[in-house]
């Protein structure tokens, strides 16, 4: 089964074009102002309109309130909401019920206990995403930090929802990450950038080529 790829943090047409041309299944737009990948709703709407049928548009939010979700969803055609903050299972379920759009919940992983806690979200969301938890005392964004976690923690685990692997992925470690975890879907952001927030179309193409070869 081919590995599906999400290119997250798209904020320019050339990065979007590279993602689509390379076979990305998902493209992510970040609605978190502290991120260097943040896009305003107006630009996000313009980019989303360029996405062809068959590629799903994901909106990444960090602890959004109802007003923010309504403002973005009112202008940007999203296929999936990604919640990447400290949202509780109850909040995730409420967002899912309110908007009628698939919801993917990011779970930050440092150890096995974090994966155990992920089970609480299985009834609240449509998909899970496993990302690396930043070490204590390290100033980091909620995602896109280029950090990975111990992939063997996922080996042999089964989930009631489809899931995606994220955290520190790049063309050089993708094959090992998929082998170690059994992931059938992966999410990359900083691993296809030449500087924070700037996707390199050549790196995007290279990552997608590696995924296609698995």
From Swiss-Prot:
Q: State which Enzyme Commission number(s) the record gives.
A: 5.3.1.24
- Gene Ontology process terms (BP): L-tryptophan biosynthetic process
Q: Which UniProt keywords apply?
A: Amino-acid biosynthesis, Aromatic amino acid biosynthesis, Isomerase, Tryptophan biosynthesis
What molecular function does GO assign, one term?
Answer: phosphoribosylanthranilate isomerase activity
InterPro entries from the xrefs?
Aldolase_TIM (IPR013785), PRAI_dom (IPR001240), RibuloseP-bd_barrel (IPR011060), TrpF_fam (IPR044643)
SUPFAM superfamilies from the UniProt entry: Ribulose-phoshate binding barrel (SSF51366)
Reactions it catalyzes: N-(5-phospho-beta-D-ribosyl)anthranilate = 1-(2-carboxyphenylamino)-1-deoxy-D-ribulose 5-phosphate
The answer, when asked if Amino-acid biosynthesis is one of the entry's keywords, is yes
Enzyme class per UniProt: isomerase
> Which residues are the signal sequence here?
none
Gene3D superfamilies registered for this protein in UniProt: Aldolase class I
Q: Which residue windows are coiled coil?
A: none
Pathway per the UniProt entry: Amino-acid biosynthesis; L-tryptophan biosynthesis; L-tryptophan from chorismate: step 3/5
The UniProt family comment states: Belongs to the TrpF family.
List the protein's name.
N-(5'-phosphoribosyl)anthranilate isomerase
- Origin organism is Rhodospirillum centenum (strain ATCC 51521 / SW)
Quick one: which gene encodes this? trpF
């Amino acid at each position: 089964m081919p590995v599906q790829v999400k290119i997250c943090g798209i904020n320019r047409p050339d990065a979007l074009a590279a993602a689509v041309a390379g076979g990305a299944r998902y493209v992510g737009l970040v609605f978190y102002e502290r991120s260097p990948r943040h896009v305003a709703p107006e630009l996000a709407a313009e980019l989303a309109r360029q996405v062809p049928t068959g590629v799903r548009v994901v909106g990444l939010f960090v602890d959004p309130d109802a007003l923010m979700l309504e403002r973005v969803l009112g202008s940007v055609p999203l296929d999936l909401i990604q919640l990447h903050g400290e949202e509780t299972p109850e909040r995730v379920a409420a967002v899912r019920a309110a908007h009628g759009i698939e919801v993917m919940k990011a779970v930050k992983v440092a150890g096995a206990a974090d994966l155990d806690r992920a089970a609480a979200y299985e009834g609240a969301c449509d998909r899970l995403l496993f990302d690396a938890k930043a070490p204590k005392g390290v100033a980091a964004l909620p995602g896109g930090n280029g950090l990975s976690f111990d992939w063997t923690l996922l080996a042999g685990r089964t989930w009631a929802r489809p899931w995606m692997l994220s955290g520190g992925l790049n063309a050089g470690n993708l094959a090992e990450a998929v082998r170690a975890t059994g992931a059938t879907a992966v999410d990359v952001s900083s691993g296809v950038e030449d500087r924070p927030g700037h996707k390199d179309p050549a790196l995007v193409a290279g990552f997608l080529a590696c995924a296609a070869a698995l």
